[in-house]
Amino acid sequence: MSKRILAKQTAELIGQEVKLMGWANSRRDHGGVIFIDLRDESGLVQVTVHPDSKEAFKLAEGVRDEYVLKVIGKVIEREEKLINPNLETGTVEVVVETLGILNKSEPLPFAVSVGPENKEEQNVGEDVRLKYRYLDLRRPKMQHMLKRRAEMYAFIRKYMEANDFTEVATPILANSSPEGARDFLIPSRFNPGKFFALPQAPQQFKQLLMVGGVPRYYQFATCFRDEDTRADRLYGDFYQLDLEMAFVDDGEEVRELIDPLVLRLTTEFAGKKLTFKDIP
């Protein structure tokens, strides 16, 4: 047994020895038995350390929130009265045979973990969140947002490819072009006194693609603009779905492509009701 499994898989592996790795979400000492809620990218599972596993128990006594742990143990069913209906893995627990501390954690500047019974997250100022970004990214809300963004990207890719678009990543180091804001300039080491410009938009490149025989192009473009912060974008860089179509007679063809995409993104990812007549 050498392969690591995820917390959510434990419910299907009753009676088997498993290896888990993740963060200590919380630790409780109940009458000499130590319970640790182990968290990984799939969720939580309770691991139980008994005093007869002397080495593991000694280590478990010193475990604190956000310690990174390696657990080897046996999955067993919980007694009916101990089942936690608020937890996906609440019908099982892992009885620890071997416990390893992969990394310790200093006292936390804010709470990272959120228990299954408490869905509320601590209200933390943005300046603190950005200073400890690696901790902020562990919070359930941030994990959810990152996964939803990845799902949205996958949805858009599938939609664009179904409509015969080709995804092309265009260059980041380019020459300056007339756009609506100032360029970010990067000195060229090989050409003293010369500069690259970070693209405000991939306009020149997508026009080259149209001429070059790629009539339907798209990408998730990173755009760089030296302009004041706006309500819909941060200073410096932002991301957009960029696309171009050749051989189009009028705007109606573009609307027939974009309207269904906007409709589905709004309803499926923003959770808002929208109909075609709502789209201007």
Give the label of every model feature segment:
Residues M1-P280:
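Class II aminoacyl-tRNA synthetase catalytic cores and aaRS-like
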